[in-house]
Design a protein with these regions (language model features):
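Immediate post-signal peptide segment of exported/extracytoplasmic ligand-binding proteins
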Residues: 20-34, 153-163, 300-319
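Beta->alpha turn/N-cap motifs
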Residues: 69-70, 80-93, 109-110, 140, ...
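Ligand-binding "clamshell"
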Residues: 96-107, 111-126, 208, 220-234
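A bilobed periplasmic-binding-protein/Venus flytrap-type ligand-binding module shared by bacterial periplasmic
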Residues: 134-145, 239-253
Length: 320
């Protein structure tokens, strides 16, 4: 395997979050503090949650910017440096902070994270926004047509000739990383490159790579006219995205429950691709992307929330 640029070691991430986060005290008793991330999708979702709360209430909302990983976000919540996350992913949390076996069934994955997040961390995992941001192998449209590609298993015919670029963090991932890929699909690539996730799309579009592994909702998929290959042997678990909040903050401000439930099913995979493109390719600030999305949907003012979910979460938080 050729490695173009390595990932930051986990130890460094733990050291970073062990320090005080800038602009935030060690206690969040009086504020709603929302975690953002280093890539556009999590930034947009953090803005959507922030602006929804500000639109529907008079509560004060602060964001922590540029949290680099789910691990850092989890530890920050443990330290009570934040209490709401705009976007968490079922597959990431199952194999990450929950240290459980990957689950390819979306409903089972959602139930596992919902139940275990409440039991282990005293946090509420809300219903999905409506999109699944999973890992996906992708190729250029002309390459797919030339080699008649539509499924990942068909890459076996190109395993010795295709140049394949993947996200650095995926290579060593337990459960659904490269070792799991080789075991599931029964082959490996001769020309295999590890690189930062932000580089894979341009590397594919420019012809430096023939196949890459990226995220299924990235805005550059449409920009570069890329084709997603079907994970026909079901290697990758479900990565449905939801907001997450601590029981403590929901108990203090129970109105947050209905606000976050309004977002259930509000963003399709295609819509998330479009929003990501606006931020990453059109260079529109995530704050503006979120604002325009919410204005188009009238801040979901007329949405009737799922009464079953409302009753469930109120019961878990122990509020009326």
């Amino acid at each position: 395997m050729k490695k173009l640029k390595g990932a930051v070691p986990l130890l460094l991430a733990l050291v970073l979050v062990s320090c005080s986060l800038p602009g935030v005290s060690s206690s969040v008793e009086n504020d709603i503090i929302v975690a953002s991330g280093t890539y556009t999708e999590r930034q947009i979702l953090a803005e959507i949650v922030t602006q929804m709360v500000e639109h529907d209430t008079d509560l004060s909302v602060t964001q922590i910017k540029n949290l680099g990983s789910t691990t850092m976000t989890h530890i920050a919540m443990e330290k009570k440096s934040l209490n709401v996350v705009g976007g968490m992913y079922t597959g990431t949390s199952l194999t990450g902070e929950l240290a459980m076996t990957p689950e390819t069934d979306p409903e089972k994955a959602m139930e596992l994270v919902r139940t275990n997040y409440l039991k282990k961390f005293n946090r509420i995992w809300f219903p999905s926004y409506g999109f699944d941001n999973t890992y996906a192998f992708m190729v250029r449209k002309d390459f797919a047509e030339q080699h008649h590609l539509s499924k990942v298993s068909q890459l076996e015919a190109l395993k010795d000739t295709a140049k394949v670029g993947v996200d650095s963090s995926w290579v060593e991932r337990p459960g659904d990383g490269y070792e799991a890929f080789k075991a599931k699909y029964g082959f490996e690539f001769s020309n295999f490159y590890s690189m930062d996730i932000g580089l894979v799309y341009s590397a594919l579009a420019s012809g430096n790579m023939d196949v890459v592994l990226g995220y299924s909702t990235d805005g550059r998929i449409n920009s570069y006219d890329l084709v997603l290959l079907e994970d026909d042997l079901k290697l990758f678990p479900a990565y449905d995205c939801s907001p997450v909040a601590t029981v403590e903050i929901l108990k203090k401000y129970p109105e947050l429950i209905e606000i976050l439930l309004k977002l259930e099913g509000s963003i399709s995979s295609e819509k998330m691709q479009e929003l990501n493109k606006q931020a990453s390719e059109d260079r529109i600030e995530p704050q503006i992307v979120a604002k325009e999305f919410l204005e188009e949907n009238h801040y979901f003012d007329d949405v009737q929330v799922n009464e079953k979910e409302l009753e469930r979460i109120r019961g878990e938080v122990n509020v009326q």
